[in-house]
Amino acid sequence: MAEASRWHRGGASKHKLHYRKEVEITTTLQELLLYFIFLINLCILTFGMVNPHMYYLNKVMSSLFLDTSVPGEERTNFKSIRSITDFWKFMEGPLLEGLYWDSWYNNQQLYNLKNSSRIYYENILLGVPRVRQLKVRNNTCKVYSSFQSLMSECYGKYTSANEDLSNFGLQINTEWRYSTSNTNSPWHWGFLGVYRNGGYIFTLSKSKSETKNKFIDLRLNSWITRGTRVIFIDFSLYNANVNLFCIIRLVAEFPATGGILTSWQFYSVKLLRYVSYYDYFIASCEITFCIFLFVFTTQEVKKIKEFKSAYFKSIWNWLELLLLLLCFVAVSFNTYYNVQIFLLLGQLLKSTEKYSDFYFLACWHIYYNNIIAITIFFAWIKIFKFISFNKTMSQLSSTLSRCVKDIVGFAIMFFIIFFAYAQLGFLVFGSQVDDFSTFQNSIFAQFRIVLGDFNFAGIQQANPILGPIYFITFIFFVFFVLLNMFLAIINDTYSEVKADYSIGRRLDFELGKMIKQSYKNVLEKFRLKKAQKDEDKKTKGSGDLAEQARREGFDENEIQNAEQMKKWKERLEKKYYSMEIQDDYQPVTQEEFRELFLYAVELEKELHYINLKLNQVVRKVSAL
């Protein structure tokens, strides 16, 4: 009676364990399905914001304003500007020709211009372009006493403290008088510094001839001086065919060393967001995204209340919190961006005779694009949380999680050597090789060396002795030693994980079986596959397996051997538990596992001894 009671309690606990497994697997499946719907919605939302026409519009505009030069003078396009003379040639030539389109290719007057230029006949110039200059004061640096007789003036690099705020030159109009900023546009991060808004501003005219005369007047009156550090050329376009705005900024920086460094920004953005039916579909996806965000936030709050400090011990929970934070930032950016469009767009489009500052809206559009791109990246990374139902993927994810400590230790050693070589390259080659001109460039150059994309001739020419030594030792220690050490860590951990997985079944793999079973049930429900019960009935109805085998042509010896093997299998299954037919299993302790391992070793020794004896017997029999 006591044994029956004990058996009943064991069966009940076993049934509860099985039920708990099923509940856990079902919950995981529900979370997986819900998350896939969220991920699909997020992908539609993000890819719906990107239009292939954005790239083509940027390409067309960059070709017009960066690559076009005056016929016969190659150094008059914007990319090749190296001096003040080249800059004025560009302003009076390619820039004017690119901004003012008032006739067709056959010199006929464009119709319905309404006092606006149409670049490439399709892109309306919004308002008028603006040219803005920032300067530094004299005596912002010191001249060494031995050279003061040769040079009394000194203009340092640009900083907000060194900026010149005084009027100069003719001291009339805004191009000669300093104007403070009245916009919320972010400061510009250039090659040589961070430039704030404001400065000496010149607004172009609607007339091409007036603008050209003004450029000539500025050049003759030396608008660009030794204190000039940067000039911005800003203007905006709108293409109604693809509903895109193109905000363009051309930047010419004047370093203290002399010469000119050019850079540019082309932002094709969709400021009129809800126009077509597809746009409203994207809006519905945005609303759905907010609903998902509310649901996921509620779930995580409940988990934190339930598990408290234990919640923060899982790396997946930290990823969940990071993803929620990014989603909230994306929603706040999108809300602020849409509010600013609603408040500013109408005013900007009305001011046709003034410069329309769309740069502020373009920057916020880029910020939102960046944050939503980072969000969808981590959303895809979270997929690894749900792939444990597949044995191979579970082994890979377990390998990465188990070798984290080893990789961190390896990374410390790797980056010590890596940064040491980066400093060596910067100090030895920095003044002569562009790839090592800054410490950041040195780091990226070394990554390129690892990938095999590097100009060895440059460092060899800069330093014929240290150049080859630097290159060979870097390749040896980083490429041959450290990277192979990294692969060894991964391989060793993967072997350990694979051995652990071969010992016993994991609960995670039950999820895969449940998915397969659900798939089979769906096929059977729609009659795309015969039910397993029907197949069993059909097999039983045809008679005994032996009779069926005789009908199929098997001889009696094969049938008897098969029946004997079946009896042996049934006897073994009664005596020993089989992992294939067990519904549940009790966890094995470390002590039990050690005893089982030692027992397996002893069995292996006995098998080896028996094998030797058997070989001896075979040799004796063969010798007779």
Curated annotation (Swiss-Prot):
Q: Which residues form a coiled coil?
A: 556-576
**Topology feature Cytoplasmic, residues:** 1-31, 298-314, 382-406, 491-624
Instruction: List all membrane-crossing ranges.
Output: 32-52, 277-297, 315-335, 361-381, 407-427, 470-490
Identify the taxonomic lineage of the organism of origin. Answer: Eukaryota, Metazoa, Chordata, Craniata, Vertebrata
Protein source organism? Homo sapiens
Glycosylation sites (chain numbering): 115, 138
Query: Record keywords: Membrane included?
Result: yes
Compartmental location: Membrane
Superkingdom of the source?
Answer: Eukaryota
Listed GO molecular functions? calcium channel activity; calcium ion binding
Q: In which tissues is it expressed?
A: Expressed only in testis. Expressed also in brain and kidney.
* Protein's recorded name: Polycystin-2-like protein 2
Q: Does the keyword ATP-binding apply?
A: no
Encoding gene (name) = PKD2L2
Function summary:
Exhibits a lower single conductance but no spontaneous channel activity. May function as a regulator of calcium channels or a channel component involving Ca2(+) homeostasis.
